[in-house]
Amino acid sequence: MKFLAVLVLLGVSIFLVSAQNPTTAAPADTYPATGPADDEAPDAETTAAATTATTAAPTTATTAASTTARKDIPVLPKWVGDLPNGRVCP
């Protein structure tokens, strides 16, 4: 009987946690609250700067993360860590 009670409590807690954390994120609001009028064109400098900033940031973060990542797994034996590198087993 205790086992059944534990299973019910576990199921209820999982349900409550999943209800609080949605699996899909809501789309972000990408439009400014106040923008240029319909007949007014956006400034070329502002548009170019925003485009450069958004394209440069992800590339830099990816490069930094890939160069600092460790290649081996310290917890496992050395021969297990060598398997992804293409080395032959002992």
From Swiss-Prot:
Q: Which segment of the chain is annotated as a signal peptide? A: 1-20
Show the segment(s) annotated as 3 X 8 AA tandem repeat of T-T-A-A-[APS]-T-T-A.
Answer: 46-69
Q: In which tissues is it expressed?
A: Expressed in mammary, salivary glands and prostate. Also detected in lung. Mainly expressed in cancer cell lines of breast origin. Highly expressed in lymph node-positive compared with node-negative tumors. Detected in all lymph node containing metastatic cells.
Pfam family example for this protein?
A: MUCL1
Region of interest called Disordered, as start-end residue ranges on this chain:
25-68
Attached carbohydrates are found at: 23-24, 30, 34, 46-47, 51-52, 54-55, 59-60, 62-63, 66-68
Q: Post-translational modification, briefly? A: O-glycosylated.
sequence repeat ranges per the UniProt record: 46-53, 54-61, 62-69
Q: Answer yes or no on keyword Protein transport.
A: no
Q: Where in the cell is it found?
A: Secreted; Membrane
Record's compositionally biased regions (Low complexity): 25-36, 44-68
Which GO cellular component terms, listed alphabetically, does the Swiss-Prot or TrEMBL entry include?
extracellular region; Golgi lumen; plasma membrane
Keywords from the UniProt entry: Glycoprotein, Membrane, Repeat, Secreted, Signal
Q: Output the superkingdom of the source species.
A: Eukaryota
Q: What does this protein do?
A: May play a role as marker for the diagnosis of metastatic breast cancer.
Any idea what this protein is called?
Mucin-like protein 1
UniProt lists the gene as MUCL1
